[in-house]
């Protein structure tokens, strides 16, 4: 950091998909330094130094939020002295550097107004409301800012996790969690435009993101039966198990293993074209892999990733549909 400049940034990305997000980041911003990936429970975070215009970073599809790192505090204690140390550090922030970073965004930003959000992850003897009240008062009284609303102002976020606190300035509009997840999954599949895609997961908001970002020729969404009646604005939507598909029709499948795995794998083998790729979110991984080996379905496992969602651990299994027998590859119902 030099005078009146912030060069340290933080990306908030889907948990378990941090490396996918980092791959997109390196593609967009080639001059990165001091990259640090911190996996998390619901979200992961990527910290990095970038000395060029942040405008290039605002269009990242894999991130829920992009923020400039204003200050980082360590050894934060759980009692009132910890809150006091946070407040003392906020008093010393370089407001000119914060305002300069905010003005680097496109459009007009009111750098005299602010909004503040706070998250606490851990057990403390001070509340979220106490932190917000104390920090807001400092921003008003010490730094001369006024409170406002909307997105065209200084959007401060204070994150307190364990014994560390981060004060950041959020930049850009960000993406919904659904959109970021959908992009990362499609990037893992190396999805091409004008493809035929089957989506059979749980968050139907992912469908709109896939349609907007990848423009498939066919986007078919199969909702779990408990989601019957859900409002979906894009693609063809049906209830899983009620819409037959032509064999070999689909190029890519994004699925959540929720039913009988043998039936699901058999249907996956039937509808995927030779060379087609599927990404399946699986909770009982060992059982799933065991059935693939036992039943000898025509798939090869390309990759396995860990994923945490709503407090539960899953694996993302990337499968390619084989077109011929290869004894060197793991295969999953294939008769010759």
Where do the PLM segments sit?
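Non-catalytic nucleic-acid substrate-recognition regions in nucleic-acid-modifying enzymes
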Residues: 2-148
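Conserved alpha-helix/loop element of class I SAM-dependent methyltransferases that forms part
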Residues: 177-196
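A short acidic, Gly/Pro-enriched loop at the edge of an enzyme's catalytic core
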Residues: 240-254
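Conserved beta-strand signature within the Rossmann-like core of class I S-adenosyl-L-methionine
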Residues: 275-283
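S-adenosyl-L-methionine
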Residues: 224-243
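Conserved class I S-adenosyl-L-methionine
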Residues: 193-205, 209, 220
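Core SAM-dependent methyltransferase catalytic element
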Residues: 47-50, 306-336
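A short glycine-rich, Lys/Arg-flanked "PGG" loop and its adjoining helix->strand segment in the class I
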Residues: 262-274
């Amino acid at each position: 950091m030099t005078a009146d400049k912030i060069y340290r940034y933080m990306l908030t990305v889907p948990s378990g998909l941090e490396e996918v997000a980092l791959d997109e980041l390196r593609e967009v911003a080639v001059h990165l330094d001091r990259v640090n990936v911190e996996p998390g429970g619901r979200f992961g975070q990527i910290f990095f130094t970038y000395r060029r215009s942040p405008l290039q970073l605002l269009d990242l599809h894999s991130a829920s939020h992009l923020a400039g790192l204003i200050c980082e505090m360590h050894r934060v204690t759980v009692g009132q002295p910890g809150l006091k140390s946070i407040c003392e550090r906020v008093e010393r922030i370089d407001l000119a550097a914060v305002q300069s970073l905010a003005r680097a965004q496109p459009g007009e930003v009111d750098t005299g107004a602010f909004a503040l959000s706070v998250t606490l992850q851990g057990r403390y003897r001070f509340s979220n409301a106490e932190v917000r009240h104390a920090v807001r008062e400092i921003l008003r009284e010490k730094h001369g800012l006024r409170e406002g609303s909307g997105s065209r102002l200084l959007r401060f976020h204070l994150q307190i996790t364990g014994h560390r606190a981060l004060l950041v300035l959020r930049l850009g509009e960000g993406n919904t969690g659904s959109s970021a997840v959908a992009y990362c999954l499609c990037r893992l599949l190396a999805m091409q435009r004008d493809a035929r895609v089957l989506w059979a997961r749980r968050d139907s908001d992912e469908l709109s993101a896939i349609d907007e970002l990848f423009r498939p020729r066919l986007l078919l969404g199969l909702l779990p039966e408990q989601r019957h009646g859900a409002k979906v604005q894009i693609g063809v939507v049906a209830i899983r198990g009620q819409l037959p598909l032509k064999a070999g029709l689909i190029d890519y499948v994004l699925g959540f293993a929720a039913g009988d795995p043998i039936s699901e794998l058999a249907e996956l083998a039937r509808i995927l074209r030779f060379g087609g790729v599927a990404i399946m979110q699986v909770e009982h991984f060992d059982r799933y892999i065991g059935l693939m080996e036992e039943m000898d379905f025509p798939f090869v496992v390309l990759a396995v990733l860990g994923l945490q969602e709503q407090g539960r651990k899953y694996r993302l299994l990337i499968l390619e549909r084989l077109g011929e027998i290869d004894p060197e590859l793991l295969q999953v119902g294939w008769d010759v």
